[in-house]
Every structure is written in structure tokens, then in C-alpha cells.
Amino acid sequence: MYFLNRTFLKGYYIMKKLNRIKPLSRGHEITWWVCRALLFIWGVWGMLHGYTSEFVQATFAIIFTHLWDMFQLFGGRSFITKVPAYMQTLLNVFICFGCVVGTTLNTRTDFTGIDIPEHIFAGYLACTGAYVLSEIMQGEKQPIKISVQALFSLGFAVSILVGWEYYEFTMDRLYGFTMQHGQAPYSHGLTDTMVDLMLGTGGALAAMFIEAFRRVGIIGGKDRHEKRAAYLAQRAEVKKEKMRLKALEEQSGEIK
């Protein structure tokens, strides 16, 4: 009884330390639950028709659709709690499309072209997420240069794409899957890997330029001119500060 009471109290204190989940807009919430429902139906349908791996895949996919919620609950005071909800929406749509549409076409039809939009969008999504993460980690008081942000986001996206190919290679070797469309003695699997990386990198490059131009106000919606003015004002401040430091260095040199 003492052990149960102690366990209950520990659980209570842990729950009190968890953050509250921020309120969501109705559009995000509906999109998330539609994606989860489709994944659940797809997984159960696959299991009933002999595709047990699809049910396992759907289970893990549904868990990943709750990433934002887990960030909010367990993130404490770290930057991860500041990730915007629309990133989870993009991820959920991608996961749902990749599983329900992509996997179904790959396992039940001879159509193999679904990998092309999947990998392009994966690269775009990874690069866009890297832009958001770089801004959050840097903080509002220390704005990051757009060129540095672009290079970081591209490198981050390519790293994610390479990590996914490691995953595909491992699953094929351990469980006999054909995620890379080839077995060890043949070169077709290597070709598929390289094509996937090139497609994903293409999507990441597109996101790198689009997000950079959007953040400096070259393209965008109604707030484009405001962003452009803020960016130019920031550049002017940086230039002014550099000139001030240069003048101080020259003065100190003359004194010496």
C-alpha cells in the first residue's frame, strides 16, 4: 500500500510539472484528426487483409502526428515548445499521404512514380522546419543573417534525407523489406537511394530560396512590405554598428 501511494504521489508531481498544451486553431485541429483517422483506418484495413506491417507503420505514424503535443507537454522551458503548430500540420499531411497513398501504391500496384513528389516534399518540409528552428534557437533579440539561416537549413534538410536513407537501408537488411527497391548484390538499390537524395535535395533547395525571399519581403502575402522594411532597417542598424566599431578602432589606433 505504501508503494502504491508513493507511486501515485510521484505520478501526481510529474503531471504537475508538465506544460499545458497551447490552444489550436480549428483548421489545424481538424486536419490533424482527419490525418490520424485515415492512418488508423488504413492500418486496420491492411491488418485485416494480411498486411501486418502496415498496421505497425500506421501505429508509429499516428505517434509522430502527436509530436507537437509532446513538445508542448515535455518541453519544459526549452525552445522546442515554441515550434509553431503549422509545422505539425505539414508533417501530418506528409505522413498521411506517404502512408495511405504512397505505401498503398507501392505494395499493391506497379506504379513507382509516387516516390518523386514524396521526396521533393520531404526535402521542402525539412528545410522549412530548419528555418523555423534556427529562428527559435537564435531568439528574437539576436536576429540571424538570412544567408547563414539558408545554409543551415539546407544542411539540416540534407542530413534528414541522408538519415532516412540509412533507415531504409537498415530496414531492408534486417527485415527483408524492399524500401530501396533492391537487394545487396544489385546496384538498383543504390540508384534508388541516390535518386531519392537528389529529389529531396531539390526540394530543400527550393525551400531554401523561397523561405529566404519570404523572410526578407521579396515574396509573400499582405505583410511582404512590412517584412521588407524591417529587414532593410535591420541591415541599416548592422551597418551603422559596424561603422561605429570601425571608428572606435581607428581612434584607438591613433591614440597608440
Positions of PLM-derived features:
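Bulky hydrophobic segments
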Residues: 2, 7-185, 194, 201-256
